[in-house]
Amino acid sequence: MLIKVKTLTGKEIEIDIEPTDKVDRIKERVEEKEGIPPQQQRLIFSGKQMNDDKTAADYKVQGGSVLHLVLALRGGDSILTPCV
């Protein structure tokens, strides 16, 4: 089934998946098309963040559904310096 993944810039990526595909597999497909590593991706469907271990069917994703891609960027380490 064909679904769409919408990025924050509004770009829509069309991906062919199976209902039994896990979310981590969907993220791999996004990486193939956009070059974004799965660990930096957060997929949102119906207002909920999708768990990597669940399937598209678990979230009731159907053909024509639109998932929203959010980037999960990790912040740098903070360095504490004593005030003198």
From Swiss-Prot:
It comes from Drosophila melanogaster. GO terms for molecular function: protein tag activity; ubiquitin protein ligase binding. It comes from the Eukaryota. It is found in: Nucleus. This is Ubiquitin-like protein NEDD8. The keyword Nucleus applies. GO terms for biological process: cell population proliferation; female germ-line stem cell population maintenance; modification-dependent protein catabolic process; negative regulation of smoothened signaling pathway; protein neddylation; regulation of protein stability; regulation of proteolysis; regulation of smoothened signaling pathway. Covalently attached to cullins. There is a cross-link at G76 (Glycyl lysine isopeptide (Gly-Lys) (interchain with K-? in acceptor proteins)). Disruption phenotype: Flies die from growth arrest in the first-instar larval stage.
